[in-house]
């Protein structure tokens, strides 16, 4: 091979390597508040160890629907079972998503409680895995984007 051909092969190899590194970096840092838009159905369960909720300490489970605005705001409805006591509530709150698709959110329920979560978004932004990050809970769960949501079809 001539020097010119070797140089071209080396330049092409370097170019391919750099473009694949850039693609990998952008894939790792692809999330922001705008990544969460639309409605998600969620479920969480675990234990209320010492949080001040009706029913007191004991098993804890909840299901609901959360709607994100893509700008750091959210609202939703939730049905909670706290040690067998059923609580129907609505909430509003805020969230923040980091570039690595991890985040935090805080929901203030109309029954006087505020619950904080840490989460990660996966499955091409369609699924969320979360834990309650407040003391007094050992609760985890997941949320799935609703395909019937008009915004999810855009």
Q: What does each model-identified segment do?
A:
Residues 2-12:
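Bacterial N-terminal signal peptides that target proteins for export
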Residues 11-20:
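Bacterial N-terminal signal peptides
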Residues 24-154:
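Mature soluble binding/inhibitory domains
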């Amino acid at each position: 091979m001539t020097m010119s051909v070797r140089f071209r092969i080396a330049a092409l190899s370097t170019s391919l390597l750099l473009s694949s590194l850039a693609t990998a970096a952008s894939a790792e840092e692809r999330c922001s508040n705008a990544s969460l838009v639309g409605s998600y159905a969620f479920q969480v369960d675990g234990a209320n160890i010492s949080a001040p909720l009706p029913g007191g300490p004991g098993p804890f489970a909840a299901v609901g629907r959360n709607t994100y605005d893509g700008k750091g705001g959210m609202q939703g409805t939730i049905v909670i079972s706290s040690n067998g006591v059923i609580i129907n509530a609505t909430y509003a709150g805020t969230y923040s998503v980091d570039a690595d698709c991890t985040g935090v959110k805080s929901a203030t329920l109309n029954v006087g409680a505020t619950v904080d979560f840490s989460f990660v978004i996966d499955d091409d932004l369609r699924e969320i895995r979360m834990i309650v990050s407040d003391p007094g809970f050992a609760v985890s769960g997941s949320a799935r984007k609703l395909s019937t949501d008009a915004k999810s079809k855009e």
